[in-house]
């Protein structure tokens, strides 16, 4: 059986995915399906580099500003909803174009979902105790040795996925990367093109984007989110672009430190994305 082919444009943050996908969609009767774990939320705009109003008017977009921060959302939910949305776009004789850089969302969509066993509460509790006693760096090194494929996709400072990786290993004796290989076949064939730029150019674009976000009012956006009653501990706010301004607003960072960390964290994130994207043969260097 031949599955419908879907074009995917992936790539690191600030590479220019949105502009490229919009231009492609305009030429090919397309609609864009966003594979971005944060642009889905209505409250997050500047810090996620969400497409502008003009860009959203130019081409129909999906999974942009569709959920509230109070609604739980995950890669699994996204993959299920995205498959239905892709089928609907095709049924209307339009061309769906997936665009995004969230590796978990792309993994779930392109490779399908896998059933990863839940760990016993005791295992998680023990890991949380170890985290407080040994620190995240020690636990991350343990994960690197046990599941290097999964570890290379993580930010060592983010403990949620780190703990998840270790609890699966301790509960099942198998790494998460093993379960990722057992995924069910998605109902589409995805043609993934990874957009990239020379590293120096990419880093310059990242630094410029951070400066532009601050000029556009990132600090005010974060203040409004916190004043609306959202906890800084919810997962979408514990991400690059929001955690740094929150630390600044709470007095933990100076303004200059916040800018430097925001740029550094974003560059580090781009490196992790590119490591994951190496699995795809089709790479396109933009200039």
Task: Label every model-predicted segment.
Residues 1-287:
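Phosphate/pyrophosphate-binding catalytic cores of soluble transferases and nucleic-acid-acting enzymes
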């Amino acid at each position: 059986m031949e599955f419908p082919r879907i074009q995917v444009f992936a790539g690191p943050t600030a590479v220019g995915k949105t502009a490229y996908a919009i231009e492609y969609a305009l030429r090919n009767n397309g609609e864009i399906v966003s594979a971005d774990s944060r642009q889905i939320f209505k409250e997050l705009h500047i810090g996620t580099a969400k497409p502008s109003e003009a860009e959203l008017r130019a081409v129909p977009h999906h999974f942009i500003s569709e959920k509230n921060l109070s609604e739980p959302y995950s890669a699994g939910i996204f993959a299920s909803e995205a498959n239905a949305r892709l089928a609907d776009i095709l049924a209307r004789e339009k061309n769906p174009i997936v665009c995004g850089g969230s590796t978990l969302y792309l993994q779930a969509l392109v490779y399908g979902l896998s059933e990863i066993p839940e760990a016993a509460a005791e295992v998680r509790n023990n890991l949380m105790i170890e985290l407080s006693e040994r620190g995240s760096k020690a636990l991350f090194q343990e994960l690197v040795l046990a599941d290097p494929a999964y570890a290379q996709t993580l930010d060592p400072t983010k403990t949620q996925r780190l703990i998840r990786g270790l609890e699966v290993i301790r509960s099942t004796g198998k790494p998460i990367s093993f379960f990722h290989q057992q995924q069910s076949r998605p109902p589409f064939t995805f043609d993934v093109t990874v957009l990239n730029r020379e590293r120096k150019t990419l880093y310059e674009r990242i630094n410029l984007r951070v400066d532009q976000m601050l000029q556009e009012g990132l600090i005010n956006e974060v203040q409004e989110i916190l004043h609306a009653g959202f906890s800084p501990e919810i997962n979408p706010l514990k991400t690059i672009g929001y955690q740094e301004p929150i630390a600044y607003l709470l007095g933990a960072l100076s303004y200059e430190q916040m800018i430097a960390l925001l740029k550094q964290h974003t560059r580090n994130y781009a490196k992790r994305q590119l490591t994951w994207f190496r699995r795809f043969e089709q790479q396109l260097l933009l200039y």
